[in-house]
Amino acid sequence: MDIEIIRKTDPEIAEVILKELNRQRNKIELIASENFVSRAVMEAMGTPLTNKYAEGYPGRRYYGGCEYVDMAEELARERLKKLFGAEHANVQPHSGAQANMAAYFALLKPGDTVLGMDLAHGGHLTHGSKVNFSGQIYNFVSYGVREDTGYIDYDQVEDLAKKHKPKLIVAGASAYPRIIDFKKFREIADKVGAYLMVDMAHIAGLVAAGLHPNPVPYADVVTTTTHKTLRGPRGGAILCKQEHAKAIDKALFPGTQGGPLMHIIAAKAVCFKEALSDEFKEYQKRIVENAKALANALMERGINLVSGGTDNHLMLLDLRNTGITGKELETRLDEVNITCNKNAIPFDPLGPNVTSGVRLGTPAVTTRGMKPEDMVEIADIIANMIKDENYKEKAKERVAKLLEKYPLYPDLL
């Protein structure tokens, strides 16, 4: 990236870019849905491919001059299919939400009944929230987790499925720290004649590395983002069985999108190539190791976690016994250069703008090179900030010392 070219044309935006780079370098990033892309992925996003309109699909475009962007999209599709063992892939979704929209449009009619995970229990806006298109176009019925364990209540899922006879069951979450049993979801779907869709946006990297069960053999359709644990550009993708390929492709284009972002698709292809490597698998193992180390260290310091730990890259702090809200802790940690997000916990007595929880994740800190012993240090800082707001200056010092060991993009700007 040549900041000087940007600065000559638009010094204000150049300044914003530099400030954001500085923020990323000088804060511990614990937002579970964020990560730092490789330089190769970053560079692929800023190429002449951004100039090309390419409505349609490779070999079936509505514009001329697409022979080379066709090659980029074919590489992305083939690599994605190989990565997850899928029959068909669509790499055009601009986001995970648009991937989900296309999947719904392909499988459902307005008003159809769908079973999805409650947002307050770890689901996602696009899994039936009333403020989202999904909850407005379709009749969503929500399932959740058991209050005593924090694990998905599969008995409840089956009971609701038998009662409501949904056309589609959606599995997947944005704040669920445990392994999801896709085989069990498939069995429930088959009992009521429903399609099964899995949104694996958060866990795609773990699935690719074999650290979480792969939903592809069980689901009719699988959607994902390409960032988060997959560590690619911001965007989405859809995998499906061949029998749904035509409907999925048509639902995305011309159904819900026009021209694809070919520079982003090229960056997705780079990301998928990286994800097929042995190095990526080792990286995913370190994400989980770090998450378990952070979770255990927090619990050792008296911090409760929803479900009592984690199997993946994230955890949910239950702050109900601490006297501090999720909103307050998010602010406190940001003041000492630790970035996280307040998050509702299951059966939360507080509203979504305050919350009784905070969500933490380890993909970004693992990308920086941090290790389990660093997670213990971070847990200790967080525990002290929960208990004592006056610990701020000491916490800042400890954060700065930790970040010094792991520079971010040292050769950039």
Curated annotation (Swiss-Prot):
Reported cofactor(s): pyridoxal 5'-phosphate
Residue list for modification N6-(pyridoxal phosphate)lysine: 228
Sequence similarity: Belongs to the SHMT family.
Single Gene Ontology MF annotation: glycine hydroxymethyltransferase activity
Sites marked Plays an important role in substrate specificity: 227
Complex and partners: Homodimer.
Name of encoding gene: glyA
Family annotation (NCBIfam families): PRK00011.1 (NF000586)
Enzyme class label: transferase
CDD domains noted in UniProt: SHMT
Record-listed E.C. numbers: 2.1.2.1
Designated name of the protein: Serine hydroxymethyltransferase
CC per GO annotation: cytosol
Any one of the GO BP annotations: tetrahydrofolate interconversion
Its job: Catalyzes the reversible interconversion of serine and glycine with tetrahydrofolate (THF) serving as the one-carbon carrier. This reaction serves as the major source of one-carbon groups required for the biosynthesis of purines, thymidylate, methionine, and other important biomolecules. Also exhibits THF-independent aldolase activity toward beta-hydroxyamino acids, producing glycine and aldehydes, via a retro-aldol mechanism.
Annotated (6S)-5,6,7,8-tetrahydrofolate binding sites: 119, 123-125
